[in-house]
């Protein structure tokens, strides 16, 4: 996907609002689970990261943690038993964990993605998402419905 062309399409929007996004890359393809480390490396994602998932996303991305370690990533892992609704307490906890790393990899969608996205933005850490399900339009946003 040509993100620069997409960005240019929104430069002179008739609604009068400025539309922009800070998205370096988007990879959508069957088999990307086996390429996560390769994709992150190709985009100079930091090697010292916090990987955040819930138990369901962690289960369906079996082997991702080991793949990252094998590729030389230093990975701190946070797996939630269940997260139905994101809240600021979780954001603040993740912000403390992000102080020890250089980037955050959110595995999944929904509330896990919300707290990762917002805490990464607030701590000025690089952020990547490995989406496991279709979701809303919040992937490129720096805010979250918390």
PLM-predicted stretches and their roles:
Residues 86-146:
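Glycine/threonine-rich beta-strand-loop-alpha-helix active-site module
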Residues 1-104:
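ATP/NTP phosphate-donor binding region
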């Amino acid at each position: 996907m040509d993100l620069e062309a997409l960005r240019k399409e929104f430069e002179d929007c008739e609604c009068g609002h400025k539309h922009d996004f800070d998205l370096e890359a988007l990879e959508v393809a069957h088999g990307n689970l086996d390429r996560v480390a390769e994709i992150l490396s190709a985009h100079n994602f930091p090697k010292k990261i916090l990987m955040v998932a819930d138990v369901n996303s962690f289960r369906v991305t079996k082997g991702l943690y080991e793949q990252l370690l094998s590729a030389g990533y230093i990975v701190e892992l946070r797996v939630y038993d269940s997260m139905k609704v994101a809240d600021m307490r979780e954001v603040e906890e993740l912000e403390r964990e992000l102080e020890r790393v250089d980037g955050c990899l959110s595995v999944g969608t929904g509330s896990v993605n919300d707290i990762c996205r917002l805490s990464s933005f607030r701590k000025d850490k690089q952020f990547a998402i490995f989406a496991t399900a279709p979701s809303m339009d919040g992937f490129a946003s720096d805010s979250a419905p918390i």
